[in-house]
């Protein structure tokens, strides 16, 4: 709040590190500071064997709608869905199913680890953006990524944003 952020993202493993029970308290605290929340989810599916959770919620229509109803009840403003399985038809359908269900529950959506934008902002007013870039989070993997960070951060707005809105998770490491 002190830094003027309107939204913050609670990233992967919040379901185990914070837990569902305590998430309501955290969201109320953030709202008292006039900061709204996005929560991270895995896209899951049989193609996705990642360990980061929560998993097995976004690829199942019943579980997805139940989770989105819970998010709406807490006042969460959006979700960031990560680790999609390519551009096959089934995955493209999943993107639109997530957007449609999220819109029904008043949730904004960011896609991460995903395909390039497909014009979804015209059909889904709750679509915020898609990453589809080599983002700052890669700086933890090696010096090469750190050395390229300034170049990439300047390049993405002019090259990648020509395709459509971009979600870019900038990082600062100390």
List where the protein language model places each region.
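An acidic-aromatic substrate-binding cleft motif
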Residues: 1-7
């Amino acid at each position: 709040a002190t830094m003027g952020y309107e939204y913050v993202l609670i990233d992967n493993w919040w379901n185990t590190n914070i837990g569902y029970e305590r998430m309501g308290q955290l969201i109320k605290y953030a709202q008292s500071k006039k900061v709204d929340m996005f929560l991270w989810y895995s896209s899951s599916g049989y193609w996705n064997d990642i360990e980061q959770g929560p998993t097995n919620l976004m690829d199942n229509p019943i579980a997805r709608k139940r989770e989105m109803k819970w998010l709406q009840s807490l006042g969460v403003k959006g979700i960031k869905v990560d680790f999609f399985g390519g551009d096959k038809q089934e995955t493209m359908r999943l993107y639109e199913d997530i957007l449609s269900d999220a819109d029904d529950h008043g949730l904004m959506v960011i896609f991460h680890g995903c395909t390039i934008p497909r014009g979804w902002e015209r059909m889904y007013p709750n679509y915020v953006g898609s990453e589809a870039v080599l983002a700052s989070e890669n700086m933890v993997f090696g010096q090469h990524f750190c050395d390229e960070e300034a170049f990439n951060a300047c390049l993405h707005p002019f090259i990648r944003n020509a395709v459509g809105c971009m979600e870019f998770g900038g990082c600062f490491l100390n």
